[in-house]
A protein has these predicted regions:
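N-terminal secretory signal peptides that target proteins for export/translocation
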Residues: 1-6
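Bacterial N-terminal signal peptides
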Residues: 9-23
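Extracytoplasmic copper-binding redox domains, predominantly the cupredoxin/blue-copper superfamily
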Residues: 25-279
Length: 279
């Protein structure tokens, strides 16, 4: 049997049991839905792309969070074969691209219902794994119509804990090779997911009620397709910096204005992180 939790608002976490069903596609940080807006006319969509890059001359070196063989808890599993990397700020030394940043629209004007059907058909569930005593992926963007599957590939106990704004607090023991399903509603900010048994473990989940979001790749690149034409507000967020590339510091959570033209690609080029802003 598999536990399914439904979380939202101020109510208590609901719960029910269902039989284990079919397996699911790997989660993708691609458009999957849109709510509460008037659909754009067919073909009136464009694409936003760009790269989140390190703005300093010296690239921060890769660092270990837990050195090989040095885990304080469950060392027979955690960091036994290799060090657990520090993923808070990872910069590609060749391209200066910054991985694992969120790129998304704030209060998008318009919708793309075709993208909803396409991605929910292909990937109705998104997955967060506890593997080798770390959460993978470290950063995950999902739509609230997807089911979040949190599982453990490890043969040791973990737990899953988060406290959010729109979703009820959650804290659940994860047995070895265990699995739970969670339904989340949209949040304005990333949710921090932690394991208290292994205090170094964490991940970030951003939940949207629209389809216009992405996560930056290994070279810092991001692309959001199917965006309704017109002026939109784009936000870039990275764990160690917070909001990036905003035009008005007083409204940094609103991002920057971007004009989308139907059938065209709006290329923002490189959006640089100022090293002085790293926390």
């Amino acid at each position: 049997m598999r536990w399914i939790f439904r979380s939202g608002g101020l109510g208590a976490v609901g719960l029910m049991l269902v039989a284990v069903g079919a397996r699911f596609a790997t989660a993708a940080n691609l458009p999957v839905g849109s709510l509460g807006v008037t659909p754009a006319a067919q073909g009136e969509y464009g694409t936003i792309k760009g790269r989140l890059v390190w703005g300093g001359s010296d690239v921060p070196p890769a660092r270990a969070l837990i050195e090989k063989g040095r885990a304080q808890k469950d060392p027979e599993i955690c960091a036994r074969e290799a060090a657990i990397p520090n993923r808070e700020l990872v910069v590609d030394p060749k391209t200066k691209g910054v991985v694992s940043g969120f790129a998304y629209l704030v209060k998008p004007k318009g919708s793309n219902p075709g993208a909803v059907k396409e991605l929910l058909t292909r990937s109705p569930k998104a997955e967060l794994d506890q593997k080798n005593c770390e959460f993978l992926p470290y950063v995950l963007a999902i739509h609230q119509d997807q089911t979040l599957v949190i599982k453990s590939s490890d043969p040791v106990n973990h737990n899953v804990r988060y406290a959010a704004f729109a979703n009820s607090p959650f804290n659940q023991i994860m047995a070895p090779k265990g699995e739970i399903e969670v339904k989340l509603v949209a949040e304005r900010r990333p949710i921090v997911v932690a394991c208290d048994i292994h205090s170094w473990m964490k991940a970030y989940i951003m939940v949207f009620d629209h389809p216009f979001f992405a996560v930056t790749g290994a070279d810092g690149a991001f692309e959001i397709k199917g965006v309704p034409a017109g002026e939109q507000n784009l936000v870039l967020w990275q764990e160690r910096v917070g909001y990036v590339g905003f035009t008005d510091p007083a409204k940094k959570a609103q991002g920057r204005a971007v004009t989308i033209r139907a059938g065209e690609v709006t290329d923002l080029g490189s959006v640089a992180i100022d090293p002085a802003q790293v926390k």
